[in-house]
Curated annotation (Swiss-Prot):
Its cofactor is [4Fe-4S] cluster. It is found in: Cytoplasm. It catalyses: [[Fe-S] cluster scaffold protein carrying a second [4Fe-4S](2+) cluster] + N(6)-octanoyl-L-lysyl-[protein] + 2 oxidized [2Fe-2S]-[ferredoxin] + 2 S-adenosyl-L-methionine + 4 H(+) = [[Fe-S] cluster scaffold protein] + N(6)-[(R)-dihydrolipoyl]-L-lysyl-[protein] + 4 Fe(3+) + 2 hydrogen sulfide + 2 5'-deoxyadenosine + 2 L-methionine + 2 reduced [2Fe-2S]-[ferredoxin]. Pathway: Protein modification; protein lipoylation via endogenous pathway; protein N(6)-(lipoyl)lysine from octanoyl-[acyl-carrier-protein]: step 2/2. This is Lipoyl synthase. Its EC number is 2.8.1.8. It comes from Mycobacterium tuberculosis (strain ATCC 25618 / H37Rv). The gene is lipA.
Protein backbone atom coordinates (compact mmCIF):
# COMPACT_ATOMS: atom_id res chain seq x y z
CA UNK A 1 0.00 0.00 0.00
CA UNK A 2 1.31 3.46 -0.91
CA UNK A 3 1.05 6.18 1.70
CA UNK A 4 1.46 9.94 1.65
CA UNK A 5 4.00 11.73 3.81
CA UNK A 6 1.32 12.50 6.41
CA UNK A 7 0.52 8.79 6.77
CA UNK A 8 -2.76 8.51 4.85
CA UNK A 9 -3.30 6.12 1.97
CA UNK A 10 -2.58 7.59 -1.45
CA UNK A 11 -5.55 8.42 -3.65
CA UNK A 12 -5.72 6.66 -7.02
CA UNK A 13 -5.06 10.02 -8.65
CA UNK A 14 -1.91 10.44 -6.58
CA UNK A 15 -0.70 6.95 -7.48
CA UNK A 16 -1.20 7.82 -11.15
CA UNK A 17 0.61 11.14 -10.73
CA UNK A 18 3.54 9.40 -9.06
CA UNK A 19 4.15 7.30 -12.16
CA UNK A 20 5.56 10.46 -13.78
CA UNK A 21 9.02 11.35 -12.38
CA UNK A 22 9.65 14.84 -11.04
CA UNK A 23 10.53 17.07 -13.97
CA UNK A 24 13.88 18.81 -14.42
CA UNK A 25 13.46 22.57 -14.24
CA UNK A 26 14.58 24.74 -17.16
CA UNK A 27 17.41 27.25 -16.65
CA UNK A 28 15.08 30.24 -16.27
CA UNK A 29 13.45 28.75 -13.15
CA UNK A 30 15.93 30.21 -10.72
CA UNK A 31 16.23 33.21 -8.46
CA UNK A 32 19.11 35.15 -6.98
CA UNK A 33 19.21 35.79 -3.26
CA UNK A 34 19.54 39.54 -2.82
CA UNK A 35 19.91 39.86 0.93
CA UNK A 36 19.35 43.41 2.13
CA UNK A 37 19.19 44.94 5.62
CA UNK A 38 15.39 44.72 5.96
CA UNK A 39 15.42 41.01 5.05
CA UNK A 40 18.24 40.29 7.49
CA UNK A 41 16.46 42.13 10.30
CA UNK A 42 13.19 40.28 9.65
CA UNK A 43 14.95 36.93 9.37
CA UNK A 44 16.60 37.40 12.75
CA UNK A 45 13.35 38.66 14.29
CA UNK A 46 11.31 35.70 13.01
CA UNK A 47 13.89 33.26 14.35
CA UNK A 48 14.17 35.01 17.71
CA UNK A 49 10.41 35.30 18.26
CA UNK A 50 9.52 31.86 16.86
CA UNK A 51 7.11 33.35 14.29
CA UNK A 52 5.66 31.33 11.40
CA UNK A 53 5.15 32.61 7.86
CA UNK A 54 4.18 30.90 4.62
CA UNK A 55 7.18 32.67 3.08
CA UNK A 56 9.70 30.56 4.99
CA UNK A 57 7.75 27.36 5.49
CA UNK A 58 6.83 27.04 1.80
CA UNK A 59 10.34 27.99 0.67
CA UNK A 60 9.04 30.85 -1.48
CA UNK A 61 11.69 32.04 -3.96
CA UNK A 62 10.56 35.65 -3.55
CA UNK A 63 11.10 35.88 0.21
CA UNK A 64 14.14 38.14 -0.17
CA UNK A 65 12.26 40.79 -2.16
CA UNK A 66 9.06 40.64 -0.12
CA UNK A 67 10.77 40.83 3.26
CA UNK A 68 12.93 43.68 2.02
CA UNK A 69 9.62 45.47 1.36
CA UNK A 70 8.32 44.44 4.82
CA UNK A 71 5.65 42.18 3.33
CA UNK A 72 4.85 38.64 4.50
CA UNK A 73 2.15 35.97 4.20
CA UNK A 74 0.46 34.02 7.00
CA UNK A 75 -1.48 30.74 6.83
CA UNK A 76 -4.49 30.39 9.16
CA UNK A 77 -6.84 27.56 10.03
CA UNK A 78 -4.21 24.88 10.62
CA UNK A 79 -2.12 22.69 8.33
CA UNK A 80 -4.86 20.29 7.18
CA UNK A 81 -7.27 21.27 4.40
CA UNK A 82 -10.69 19.68 3.92
CA UNK A 83 -10.25 19.90 0.13
CA UNK A 84 -7.58 18.62 -2.22
CA UNK A 85 -6.29 20.54 -5.23
CA UNK A 86 -3.86 18.62 -7.43
CA UNK A 87 -1.21 21.37 -7.41
CA UNK A 88 -1.27 22.31 -3.73
CA UNK A 89 1.31 21.18 -1.19
CA UNK A 90 -0.99 21.63 1.82
CA UNK A 91 -2.07 18.25 3.20
CA UNK A 92 -5.67 17.07 3.02
CA UNK A 93 -7.22 15.58 6.13
CA UNK A 94 -9.21 16.22 9.28
CA UNK A 95 -8.30 19.65 10.65
CA UNK A 96 -7.61 20.33 14.30
CA UNK A 97 -10.17 22.12 16.47
CA UNK A 98 -10.64 25.79 15.60
CA UNK A 99 -8.06 27.94 17.36
CA UNK A 100 -9.95 31.08 18.33
CA UNK A 101 -6.79 32.78 19.59
CA UNK A 102 -5.10 32.57 16.19
CA UNK A 103 -6.29 36.01 14.93
CA UNK A 104 -4.65 37.71 17.93
CA UNK A 105 -1.38 35.83 17.43
CA UNK A 106 -1.24 36.69 13.73
CA UNK A 107 -1.89 40.35 14.54
CA UNK A 108 0.88 40.23 17.15
CA UNK A 109 3.25 38.75 14.57
CA UNK A 110 2.41 41.51 12.09
CA UNK A 111 3.18 44.12 14.74
CA UNK A 112 6.37 42.40 15.89
CA UNK A 113 7.62 42.16 12.31
CA UNK A 114 6.68 45.77 11.58
CA UNK A 115 4.98 44.81 8.32
CA UNK A 116 3.76 47.41 5.87
CA UNK A 117 1.53 44.87 4.11
CA UNK A 118 0.34 41.45 5.26
CA UNK A 119 -1.28 38.72 3.19
CA UNK A 120 -3.45 36.21 5.03
CA UNK A 121 -4.46 32.94 3.45
CA UNK A 122 -5.70 29.68 4.88
CA UNK A 123 -7.06 26.21 4.42
CA UNK A 124 -10.64 25.34 3.54
CA UNK A 125 -12.56 24.45 6.71
CA UNK A 126 -15.68 22.67 5.47
CA UNK A 127 -15.78 20.92 8.85
CA UNK A 128 -16.93 24.17 10.52
CA UNK A 129 -20.56 25.38 10.44
CA UNK A 130 -19.50 28.69 8.84
CA UNK A 131 -16.75 27.19 6.68
CA UNK A 132 -14.20 29.25 8.61
CA UNK A 133 -15.68 32.64 7.68
CA UNK A 134 -15.39 33.92 11.26
CA UNK A 135 -11.69 33.03 11.40
CA UNK A 136 -10.84 34.87 8.20
CA UNK A 137 -12.85 37.95 9.18
CA UNK A 138 -11.58 37.98 12.77
CA UNK A 139 -7.97 37.80 11.59
CA UNK A 140 -8.40 40.87 9.38
CA UNK A 141 -10.11 42.77 12.21
CA UNK A 142 -7.37 41.82 14.69
CA UNK A 143 -4.58 42.91 12.35
CA UNK A 144 -6.26 46.24 11.64
CA UNK A 145 -6.97 46.93 15.30
CA UNK A 146 -3.36 46.34 16.32
CA UNK A 147 -1.72 47.63 13.13
CA UNK A 148 -3.89 50.43 11.70
CA UNK A 149 -1.30 51.49 9.11
CA UNK A 150 -0.70 47.97 7.74
CA UNK A 151 -2.41 46.94 4.52
CA UNK A 152 -4.16 43.55 4.61
CA UNK A 153 -4.77 41.23 1.69
CA UNK A 154 -7.09 38.29 2.33
CA UNK A 155 -6.92 35.21 0.10
CA UNK A 156 -10.03 33.10 0.73
CA UNK A 157 -11.62 29.80 -0.30
CA UNK A 158 -15.07 30.03 -1.88
CA UNK A 159 -17.14 29.27 1.26
CA UNK A 160 -19.36 27.34 -1.16
CA UNK A 161 -20.49 30.70 -2.49
CA UNK A 162 -22.84 31.24 0.48
CA UNK A 163 -23.73 34.95 0.66
CA UNK A 164 -23.84 35.21 4.47
CA UNK A 165 -20.36 33.74 4.84
CA UNK A 166 -18.94 35.93 2.10
CA UNK A 167 -20.60 39.03 3.56
CA UNK A 168 -19.03 38.39 6.97
CA UNK A 169 -15.60 38.20 5.37
CA UNK A 170 -16.11 41.22 3.12
CA UNK A 171 -17.29 43.36 6.04
CA UNK A 172 -13.93 42.90 7.79
CA UNK A 173 -12.59 45.35 5.20
CA UNK A 174 -9.34 43.98 3.76
CA UNK A 175 -7.56 46.25 1.31
CA UNK A 176 -7.65 43.41 -1.23
CA UNK A 177 -9.98 40.41 -1.39
CA UNK A 178 -8.35 37.60 -3.34
CA UNK A 179 -9.82 34.34 -4.55
CA UNK A 180 -7.71 32.31 -6.94
CA UNK A 181 -9.36 30.63 -9.91
CA UNK A 182 -5.99 28.97 -10.67
CA UNK A 183 -6.83 27.21 -13.94
CA UNK A 184 -9.06 27.12 -17.02
CA UNK A 185 -12.57 25.60 -17.31
CA UNK A 186 -11.65 22.51 -19.37
CA UNK A 187 -9.32 21.06 -16.72
CA UNK A 188 -10.80 22.79 -13.67
CA UNK A 189 -12.63 19.75 -12.27
CA UNK A 190 -9.53 17.60 -12.65
CA UNK A 191 -7.33 20.12 -10.85
CA UNK A 192 -9.78 21.56 -8.28
CA UNK A 193 -12.55 18.97 -7.81
CA UNK A 194 -14.09 20.60 -4.72
CA UNK A 195 -14.49 23.98 -6.43
CA UNK A 196 -16.32 25.14 -9.55
CA UNK A 197 -15.07 27.68 -12.07
CA UNK A 198 -18.29 29.70 -12.18
CA UNK A 199 -18.64 29.77 -8.40
CA UNK A 200 -15.10 31.09 -8.08
CA UNK A 201 -15.88 33.85 -10.57
CA UNK A 202 -19.01 34.59 -8.55
CA UNK A 203 -16.95 35.11 -5.39
CA UNK A 204 -14.92 37.78 -7.17
CA UNK A 205 -18.06 39.47 -8.50
CA UNK A 206 -19.60 39.51 -5.02
CA UNK A 207 -16.44 41.07 -3.59
CA UNK A 208 -16.42 43.72 -6.31
CA UNK A 209 -20.08 44.49 -5.63
CA UNK A 210 -19.15 44.93 -1.96
CA UNK A 211 -16.71 47.66 -3.01
CA UNK A 212 -13.49 45.72 -2.49
CA UNK A 213 -10.39 45.62 -4.66
CA UNK A 214 -10.33 42.09 -6.08
CA UNK A 215 -7.52 39.77 -7.13
CA UNK A 216 -7.01 36.31 -8.63
CA UNK A 217 -4.29 34.02 -9.93
CA UNK A 218 -3.75 31.67 -12.87
CA UNK A 219 -1.23 28.81 -12.72
CA UNK A 220 0.25 27.78 -16.05
CA UNK A 221 1.72 24.40 -16.92
CA UNK A 222 -1.23 22.27 -15.79
CA UNK A 223 -2.38 21.34 -19.30
CA UNK A 224 -4.10 24.51 -20.49
CA UNK A 225 -3.64 26.08 -23.92
CA UNK A 226 -2.65 29.69 -24.61
CA UNK A 227 -6.10 30.44 -26.03
CA UNK A 228 -7.68 29.05 -22.86
CA UNK A 229 -5.47 31.31 -20.73
CA UNK A 230 -6.61 34.36 -22.68
CA UNK A 231 -10.25 33.30 -22.34
CA UNK A 232 -9.85 32.80 -18.58
CA UNK A 233 -8.28 36.24 -18.25
CA UNK A 234 -11.30 37.68 -20.05
CA UNK A 235 -13.63 35.80 -17.72
CA UNK A 236 -11.81 37.18 -14.68
CA UNK A 237 -11.99 40.73 -15.94
CA UNK A 238 -15.68 40.36 -16.78
CA UNK A 239 -16.27 39.04 -13.25
CA UNK A 240 -14.85 42.25 -11.79
CA UNK A 241 -11.30 41.18 -11.00
CA UNK A 242 -8.95 44.16 -10.59
CA UNK A 243 -5.58 42.45 -10.13
CA UNK A 244 -4.24 39.26 -11.66
CA UNK A 245 -1.05 37.27 -11.20
CA UNK A 246 0.06 34.62 -13.69
CA UNK A 247 2.49 31.95 -12.50
CA UNK A 248 4.35 28.79 -13.49
CA UNK A 249 3.29 25.54 -11.83
CA UNK A 250 6.10 23.97 -9.79
CA UNK A 251 5.29 20.42 -8.73
CA UNK A 252 5.52 20.01 -4.92
CA UNK A 253 5.99 16.22 -4.97
CA UNK A 254 5.62 13.14 -7.16
CA UNK A 255 2.04 12.62 -5.96
CA UNK A 256 0.98 15.99 -7.35
CA UNK A 257 -0.08 16.80 -10.91
CA UNK A 258 2.83 16.49 -13.37
CA UNK A 259 4.13 19.65 -15.04
CA UNK A 260 2.65 19.59 -18.53
CA UNK A 261 4.98 22.27 -19.88
CA UNK A 262 7.41 24.98 -18.87
CA UNK A 263 6.10 28.34 -20.02
CA UNK A 264 8.87 30.53 -21.40
CA UNK A 265 9.49 34.01 -19.92
CA UNK A 266 8.54 35.71 -23.19
CA UNK A 267 5.14 34.00 -23.09
CA UNK A 268 4.51 35.47 -19.65
CA UNK A 269 5.29 38.91 -21.09
CA UNK A 270 2.70 38.33 -23.81
CA UNK A 271 0.06 37.21 -21.31
CA UNK A 272 0.78 40.26 -19.13
CA UNK A 273 0.30 42.60 -22.09
CA UNK A 274 -2.92 40.85 -23.02
CA UNK A 275 -4.21 41.21 -19.43
CA UNK A 276 -3.28 44.89 -19.34
CA UNK A 277 -5.17 45.35 -22.59
CA UNK A 278 -8.27 43.89 -20.96
CA UNK A 279 -8.17 46.64 -18.34
CA UNK A 280 -6.76 44.93 -15.25
CA UNK A 281 -5.53 47.58 -12.81
CA UNK A 282 -2.58 45.46 -11.71
CA UNK A 283 -0.79 42.61 -13.51
CA UNK A 284 2.24 40.50 -12.61
CA UNK A 285 3.29 37.51 -14.71
CA UNK A 286 6.40 35.37 -14.64
CA UNK A 287 7.84 31.92 -13.93
CA UNK A 288 8.59 32.70 -10.28
CA UNK A 289 5.70 35.08 -9.58
CA UNK A 290 3.42 33.89 -6.78
CA UNK A 291 -0.03 35.26 -5.95
CA UNK A 292 1.25 37.25 -2.96
CA UNK A 293 4.41 38.50 -4.73
CA UNK A 294 4.76 42.29 -4.49
CA UNK A 295 1.21 42.33 -3.16
CA UNK A 296 1.50 45.75 -1.55
CA UNK A 297 2.86 47.34 -4.72
CA UNK A 298 0.12 45.77 -6.83
CA UNK A 299 -2.53 47.08 -4.44
CA UNK A 300 -1.15 50.63 -4.67
CA UNK A 301 -1.05 50.33 -8.45
CA UNK A 302 -4.67 49.15 -8.55
CA UNK A 303 -5.82 51.85 -6.14
CA UNK A 304 -4.17 54.57 -8.20
CA UNK A 305 -5.69 53.15 -11.38
CA UNK A 306 -9.15 53.13 -9.79
CA UNK A 307 -8.71 56.73 -8.65
CA UNK A 308 -7.78 57.85 -12.17
CA UNK A 309 -10.72 55.97 -13.67
CA UNK A 310 -13.17 57.67 -11.30
CA UNK A 311 -12.11 61.21 -12.26
Amino acid sequence: MSVAAEGRRLLRLEVRNAQTPIERKPPWIKTRARIGPEYTELKNLVRREGLHTVCEEAGCPNIFECWEDREATFLIGGDQCTRRCDFCQIDTGKPAELDRDEPRRVADSVRTMGLRYATVTGVARDDLPDGGAWLYAATVRAIKELNPSTGVELLIPDFNGEPTRLAEVFESGPEVLAHNVETVPRIFKRIRPAFTYRRSLGVLTAARDAGLVTKSNLILGLGETSDEVRTALGDLRDAGCDIVTITQYLRPSARHHPVERWVKPEEFVQFARFAEGLGFAGVLAGPLVRSSYRAGRLYEQARNSRALASR
